[in-house]
């Protein structure tokens, strides 16, 4: 692993970790290939991202916008770290939260047909520093759609934090402002990332097996 502006870069030949080295729910034992990013590493990286966010955005009211459903764990943990920094700083700022749901996946493919559910009234974003928190950037089309929607409400600033960015030839070239990990073009689950709503209850980010894909296929 190496570190650069795109976060912790996980190489294409990263072997991951054997499942039996971690506590994995028994009902998923045959459905995963390996643990890709252990929970502890996720938390340590998230703590640093919180500091980076406050450094760039901490001078004005922040509205943290969570992209559901996959982003909720990263959102909650990132905000916990941000709140800790905020309450221990002489220059603390107010922070509010909002939620939006986007749907673009069926099975393991981004459909390109992006549905926005919720977020009908985002007028509260006007004049605010908006931090959009997402679980994963795949092609980037979903985030481009959301950014267009958010910018209609004239926020003062918009930044995007994504736990994961996938290296894929399908990418439109969009890169978020804050990145936890840059990963190979593999379908990952866990830490609230799902495959047809399954695997959100895993603590670690894992690579799904072909058995798992077949079992939970829509």
Curated annotation (Swiss-Prot):
Name by which UniProt lists this protein: Hypoxanthine-guanine phosphoribosyltransferase
Organism the protein comes from: Canis lupus familiaris (Dog)
Cofactor binding notes: Binds 2 magnesium ions per subunit. The magnesium ions are essentially bound to the substrate and have few direct interactions with the protein.
Xref: PANTHER family: HYPOXANTHINE-GUANINE PHOSPHORIBOSYLTRANSFERASE
Record-listed N6-acetyllysine modification sites: 103
Location of N-acetylalanine modifications: 2
Covalent link Glycyl lysine isopeptide (Lys-Gly) (interchain with G-Cter in SUMO2), residues: 115
GO biological process: GMP catabolic process; GMP salvage; guanine salvage; hypoxanthine metabolic process; hypoxanthine salvage; IMP metabolic process; IMP salvage; positive regulation of dopamine metabolic process
Entry cofactors: Mg(2+)
InterPro entries: HGPRT, Hxn_phspho_trans, PRibTrfase_dom, PRTase-like
SUPFAM superfamilies: PRTase-like (SSF53271)
Cross-linked residues, Glycyl lysine isopeptide (Lys-Gly) (interchain with G-Cter in SUMO1): 115
Cell compartments where the protein resides: Cytoplasm
Keyword field: Acetylation, Cytoplasm, Glycosyltransferase, Isopeptide bond, Magnesium, Metal-binding, Nucleotide-binding, Phosphoprotein, Purine salvage, Transferase, Ubl conjugation
Residues binding GMP, per UniProt: 69, 134-142, 166, 186-188, 194
Family: Belongs to the purine/pyrimidine phosphoribosyltransferase family.
Phosphothreonine sites (modified residues): 142
GO MF annotation terms: guanine phosphoribosyltransferase activity; hypoxanthine phosphoribosyltransferase activity; identical protein binding; magnesium ion binding; nucleotide binding
Enzyme's top EC category: transferase
Name of encoding gene: HPRT1
Subunit field text: Homotetramer.
Catalytic residues as annotated in Swiss-Prot or TrEMBL: 138
Catalysed conversion reaction: IMP + diphosphate = hypoxanthine + 5-phospho-alpha-D-ribose 1-diphosphate; GMP + diphosphate = guanine + 5-phospho-alpha-D-ribose 1-diphosphate
């Amino acid at each position: 692993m190496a570190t650069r502006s795109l976060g912790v870069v996980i190489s294409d030949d990263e072997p991951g970790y054997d499942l039996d080295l971690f506590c994995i729910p028994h009902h998923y034992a045959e459905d995963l290939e390996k643990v890709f990013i252990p929970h502890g590493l996720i938390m340590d990286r998230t703590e640093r991202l919180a500091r980076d966010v406050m450094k760039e955005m901490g001078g004005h009211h922040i509205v943290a916008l969570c992209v559901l459903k996959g982003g909720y764990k990263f959102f909650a943990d990132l905000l916990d770290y941000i709140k800790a920094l905020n309450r221990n700083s002489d220059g603390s700022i107010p922070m509010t939260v909002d939620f939006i749901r986007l749907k673009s996946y069926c099975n393991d493919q981004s459909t390109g047909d992006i549905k926005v559910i919720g977020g009908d009234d985002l007028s509260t974003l006007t004049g605010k520093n908006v931090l959009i928190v997402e679980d994963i950037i795949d092609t980037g089309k979903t985030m481009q759609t959301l950014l267009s929607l958010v910018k209609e409400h004239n926020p003062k600033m918009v930044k995007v934090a994504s736990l994961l960015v996938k290296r894929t030839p399908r990418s439109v070239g969009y890169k978020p402002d804050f990145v936890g990990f840059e990963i190979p073009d593999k379908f990952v689950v866990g830490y609230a990332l799902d495959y047809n709503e399954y695997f959100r209850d895993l603590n670690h980010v894992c690579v799904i097996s072909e058995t798992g894909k077949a079992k939970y296929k829509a």
